[in-house]
């Protein structure tokens, strides 16, 4: 019937056909082979508890090309004990630590990644960029896989609501000598490097053409104390034993990592019952690299010819303590593809809320929730048999305001490149057509290209900003709450010592401020010639 039901309308699809579903052609290709190799660090492969740890990996020449590469690290089993507090009135009170790894663990575990060769820095970007790149460019399915690889899963950051639990944390308590089941099972992370040579085989680094230089990858890890949170066991607010979540205090023995990487050996989990007080574990940090083997003819061509590879480089700029109306200058140059930026509360370090780009103290937790406590009506209590909930009083500051940025404009050479627009333009509209993903709230984008997909080989736009001394971001943020208790106040006195005025550091007027980080992606050309490597334009 399909063949007989044919008319002029079919010309749209079937007129002068160029394609058939019943015959296929293909292009022949040169033979190759893929193989993964483990790349080890020559030295101690453990992480420092209270300071960054640096690893430099020298890339061996196992094959002709280096393609996608991953950072591999083993997380330990976690036993989160329960502190038993003896009180004269209430008796024993159980206070749980409820250890949790931070969200986006794999990305925020890394402070910085640098790829260099012969003194030339090919790539230099913070680990946070990996998380932002995932948010901006990955589909929902790819994000789910990335989250599993990088440890951004409830089993690690919210065990109370994982593995079938519903708001029930799996605390670890000693029962007998057979051992204690961990609160959080250890697992191995595989963190994608996502450098320029990882996304397409066409951009792979031709090691065979680098006869006189070697590639090195330097990875700086954050301190372990920045990677987990616990219940504030020293300031319990109610009979549940729970309090606010906090970053561990490295000077407090109750907060040390060794409390959680070995099982408790008595019911009270007393400090004296632990066998060792080392805060490190066998992290077994190494790289996993995919190498490409080529045939003899293609190997000869790669080794003898000059190579020019168009790459994207990432630069980051930090502006600390911004509140209200501000203009910041970014020293951009060359061909800029896009900007990506976020604001974060300056007190995030108190809670290790590194991936929280909102005004809320805790990610996805409303500061002031609804309540069933009704106000009095002319001194008479209002009955509430149906347990209705109300929003409550706003007070002097609305802590429930979520978004930090209100609006922004982009200025180049004193001229508006983009007029001041509401934050939603950069938070929603810009992402709708220009990105493949659905970046979370608080991660803003502005593109000079048509699409930002990291797998896109063909450039789709950029802007040469060399005519301008700098690019300016003009923006407004919400106001942070005022610090009523005040900090240091300087009094201005006359010649007789009588106070006539006072002044206060503007940066300390608020209980916290906001830290702005801007990621810039720009084009550059990697040149490999005569066995050596360089960049067309220095960073």
Stretch-by-stretch model annotation:
Residues 1-539:
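Short, low-complexity Pro/Thr/Gly
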């Amino acid at each position: 019937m399909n063949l007989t039901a044919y008319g002029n309308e079919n010309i749209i699809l079937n007129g002068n056909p160029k394609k058939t579903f019943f015959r296929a052609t293909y292009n022949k290709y040169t033979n190759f082979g893929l193989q993964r190799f483990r790349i080890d660090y020559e030295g101690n492969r453990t992480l420092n508890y209270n300071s960054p740890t640096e690893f430099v990996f020298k890339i061996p020449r196992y094959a002709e090309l280096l393609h996608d590469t991953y950072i591999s690290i083993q997380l330990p089993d976690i036993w989160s004990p329960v502190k038993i507090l003896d009180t004269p009135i209430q008796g024993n009170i159980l206070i749980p630590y409820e250890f949790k790894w931070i969200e986006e663990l794999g990305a925020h575990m890394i402070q910085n990644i640098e790829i260099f060769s012969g003194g030339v820095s090919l790539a230099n970007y913070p680990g946070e960029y990996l998380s932002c790149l995932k948010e901006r460019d990955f589909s929902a399915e790819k994000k789910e896989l990335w989250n599993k690889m990088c440890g951004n899963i409830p089993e690690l950051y919210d065990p109370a609501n994982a593995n079938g639990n519903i708001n029930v944390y799996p605390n670890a308590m000693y029962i007998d000598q057979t051992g204690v089941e961990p609160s959080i099972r250890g697992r191995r992370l595989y963190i994608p490097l996502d450098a320029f040579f990882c996304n397409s085989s066409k951009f792979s680094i031709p090691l065979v053409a680098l006869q006189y230089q070697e590639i090195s990858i330097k990875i700086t890890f954050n301190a372990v104390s920045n990677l987990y949170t616990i219940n504030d066991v020293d300031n319990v607010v109610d009979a549940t034993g729970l309090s606010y979540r906090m970053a561990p205090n490295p000077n407090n023995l109750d907060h040390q990592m060794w409390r959680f990487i070995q099982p408790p050996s008595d019911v009270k989990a007393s400090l004296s019952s632990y066998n060792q007080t080392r805060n490190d574990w066998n992290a077994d940090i190494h790289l996993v690299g995919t190498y490409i083997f080529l045939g003899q003819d293609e190997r000869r061509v790669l080794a003898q010819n000059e190579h020019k590879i168009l790459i994207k480089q990432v630069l980051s700029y930090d502006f600390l303590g911004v509140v209200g109306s501000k203009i910041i200058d970014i020293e951009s140059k060359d061909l800029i593809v896009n900007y990506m930026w976020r604001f974060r509360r300056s007190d995030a370090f108190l809670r290790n809320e590194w991936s929280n780009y909102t005004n809320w103290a805790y990610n996805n937790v409303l500061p002031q929730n609804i309540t069933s406590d009704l106000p009095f009506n002319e001194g008479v209590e209002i009955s509430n048999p149906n347990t209705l909930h109300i929003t409550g009083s706003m007070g002097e500051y609305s802590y429930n305001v979520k978004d930090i940025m209100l609006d922004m404009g982009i200025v180049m050479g004193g001229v508006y490149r983009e007029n001041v627009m509401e934050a939603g333009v950069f938070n929603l509209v810009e992402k709708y057509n220009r990105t493949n993903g659905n970046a979370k709230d608080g991660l803003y984008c502005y593109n000079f290209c048509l699409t930002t997909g990291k797998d896109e080989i063909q450039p789709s736009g950029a802007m040469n900003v060399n005519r301008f001394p700098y690019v300016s971001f003009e923006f407004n943020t919400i106001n942070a709450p005022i610090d009523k208790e005040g900090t240091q106040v300087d009094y201005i006195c006359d010649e007789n010592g009588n106070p006539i005025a006072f002044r206060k550091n503007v940066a300390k007027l608020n209980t916290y401020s906001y830290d702005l980080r801007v990621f810039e992606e720009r084009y550059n050309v990697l040149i490999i010639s005569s066995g050596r490597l360089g960049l067309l334009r220095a960073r």
